[in-house]
Amino acid sequence: MIAILWDASHIWGYLLLHAVRSTGIPYRVLKGLDIAQTGLSGKMLMVPGGSARRKAEALGPAGAEEVRRFVRQGGRYVGFCGGAGLALADGLGLCPWKRDGMTDRLQHLVSGSLCCDLAEGSELIPPHLAGKTALLPVWWPGRFSEPDEPDGVEVLARYRAPGPDLYVADMPFSSMPADILAEWKSMYGVTLRPSLLDERPCAVSGSCGRGGWLLSYSHLETPSGNFPGSEQAGAWLLHVLRLWCGLPSDMTELPPLEFDRLPVLWEDRVLLDARASLLELLALAEHLGLLFPRNSWLLGWRSGVPGAQFNSLNAAISTTLSLRPDDRRLSLWTPRRKEFESAFALFFQGARSWLLARRLADTLADSAPGMLPRELLEDQRRALFGSPMFGGGLSEQLLNILEELV
């Protein structure tokens, strides 16, 4: 049995859910309050990406202590990105390392695949990848602060070189020649080369009592993509699940994922209408050049556009429609169905207006700066989408209703 801590996960929770469901391993989706009140059992706790701070707040002191007890008594903890950050010294304290700060915001805006050197001699690394280079995906990662002494921490992977689909903010890294990057640094003081590439640690592991943990700023749960090597992260995750959860050995890679093509098992009019309206918004944003395709499950976005929230809503609505409407889900959905319908109608109208206004502001930026005040756009954005890092807004209200149904 795998427990998945859901709080503050959004699209990263749905990505992990897709990976775990594909294996057939029994799982439970839990909130921090559930863990604090009823404890943990089973073999593994998996924590998806998202805000580590908000996950810690959801667990509270009692939930955090229960996670530590679970691992000390033989459980396994696997955390990706924000789930990795949660387990560091200033969080759960499973790993003695700390999170490294970033003074340059651009260094956080890195997404796509990186070539990573994998260690030799660790049972947690698949034999066919041990000591080799693998393509591992990162999606706006934090990073470990590596001390001079490892303090019982084993580095499993280090970043080495950019992969074929790497972006910095909304710019494909492959489109930026080295001489231009050097020129920008000299002329503007802007450094777009990710400092992660300076052989920083990507994934680490260690023990705690009778249990163990694996923390990765690479999202190993990322589905296979459309280029060679994109299956390697999933192969690593499946190896860990075989080792720690007894997954049968015949599964070698995670299946692809297209949220829009998930089967519809819950034919609810309100949910279906919401999906149709959201797809209309996404099409409008693409037409305006504010969103663009990244891969089969993710849309990229221009800087300043709330792409994370659009992606999370798409994942949430599509996944909810793919679930069976059992008694538990219906008992949660029925009392909030009308609330969701009304809130989504407000969101649709507001988001459509904001997307068009944002595009107009871009058009007027040179010829008539200030005609459409950026402060007003920011206020509207916060009301609809909240903070890019910490959520909120009308979109989070919708996500909270949908995430109860998982």
Model-derived features: positions:
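Short, solvent-exposed loop/turn segments at secondary-structure junctions
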Residues: 9-10, 51-53, 83-86, 99, ...
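Helical hinge/lid and interdomain linker segments adjacent to catalytic or ligand-binding clefts
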Residues: 9-91
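Short hydrophobic beta-strand segments
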Residues: 1-10, 264
